């Protein structure tokens, strides 16, 4: 992760310096892993024609950062040289740290008279005390154990008690809010009350007291009644009436009766 971070920061700085208008969205973990894999085996000596293909590197970077190929080749070589040196030094530091960690892990505990007492106290210590001490740095071990015991092991309730200051604490303790920073103390009742009233109380304005009365129309709409020949269309409630136009005799003469002729049966 540390090596990839070095590669990403170096590439971002290089592209922003020489291509200010370039799109950096193409620089992702894939190209970082590629550059790290290419420069991993170069060492502090840097790239050369035998162990490094500069053309392939530029072509690969051009695919992820359009315009990278227009940068001068010598500038790219200097960047690759500097980056390979940084990676080599970071890799050496990481290699030196590993034996130290192994020594610390394999180192036996110091044989003191209080070792057994400390181990017993650590076993008896509740698991949530560490969390409380991390959240409230100014809180002592005794205070954290007291609040956690009052909360019956419930970590969330213990944190809430410390923030709100509901727990008085053991004798000789002036209260949890005494040692807490201002940002972790609960708001004062007066401040909380004024804040709630200011944000949520009703605003009494003259507009709220007015009763809205819409204006009546100047002229009422007229009732529409349809007449035919000065008579109401219908008084039975029908909405429509079939009105047929009178037909002339000439028009009637053109009609054809398609009714079949009556059949006569003779006995």
From Swiss-Prot:
Tell me which residues make up the CUE domain: 124-167
Transmembrane domains' residue ranges? none
Describe the task this protein carries out: Controls PGR and ESR1 protein levels through their targeting for ubiquitination and subsequent proteasomal degradation.
Family, similarity comment:
Belongs to the CUEDC2 family.
What spans are recorded as compositionally biased (Basic and acidic residues)?
Answer: 91-107
Protein name per UniProt: CUE domain-containing protein 2
Instruction: Return the PROSITE patterns for the record.
Output: CUE
Question: What does the entry note on its domains?
Answer: The CUE domain mediates interaction with PGR and ESR1.
Gene Ontology process terms (BP): negative regulation of cytokine production involved in inflammatory response; negative regulation of macrophage cytokine production
> What is known about its subunit structure?
Interacts with PGR and ESR1.
User: What compartments host this protein?
Assistant: Cytoplasm; Nucleus
Cross-referenced CDD domains: CUE_CUED2
According to the record, the residues making up region (Disordered) are 90-125
Listed under GO cellular component are: cytoplasm; nucleus
UniProt keywords (A-Z) are:
Cytoplasm, Nucleus, Ubl conjugation pathway
An example of a GO molecular function for this protein is: ubiquitin binding
């Amino acid at each position: 992760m540390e090596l990839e971070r070095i590669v990403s920061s170096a590439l971002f700085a290089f592209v922003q310096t020489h291509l200010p208008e370039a799109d950096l969205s193409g620089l992702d973990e894939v190209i970082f892993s590629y550059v790290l894999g290419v420069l991993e085996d170069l060492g502090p000596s840097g790239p050369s024609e035998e162990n490094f293909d500069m053309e392939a590197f530029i072509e690969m970077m051009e695919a992820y950062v359009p315009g990278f190929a227009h940068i001068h080749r010598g500038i790219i070589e200097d960047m690759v040289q500097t980056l390979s040196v940084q990676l080599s030094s970071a890799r050496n530091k990481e290699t030196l740290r590993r034996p130290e960690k192994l020594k610390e892990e394999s180192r036996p505990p110091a044989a003191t008279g209080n070792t057994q007492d400390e181990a017993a106290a650590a076993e008896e210590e509740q698991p949530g005390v560490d969390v409380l001490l991390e959240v409230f740095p100014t809180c002592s071990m005794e205070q954290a154990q007291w609040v956690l015991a009052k909360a019956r092991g419930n970590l969330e309730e213990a944190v809430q008690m410390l923030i709100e200051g509901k727990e008085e604490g053991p004798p000789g303790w002036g209260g949890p809010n005494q040692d807490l920073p201002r940002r972790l103390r609960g708001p004062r009742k007066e401040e909380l009350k004024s804040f709630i009233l200011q944000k949520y109380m009703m605003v009494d304005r003259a507009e709220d007291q007015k009763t809205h009365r819409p204006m009546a129309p100047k002229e009422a709409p007229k009732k529409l009644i349809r007449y035919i020949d000065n008579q109401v269309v219908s008084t039975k409630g029908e909405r429509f009436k079939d009105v047929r136009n009178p037909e002339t005799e000439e028009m009637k003469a053109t009609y054809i009766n398609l009714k079949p002729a009556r059949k006569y049966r003779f006995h």
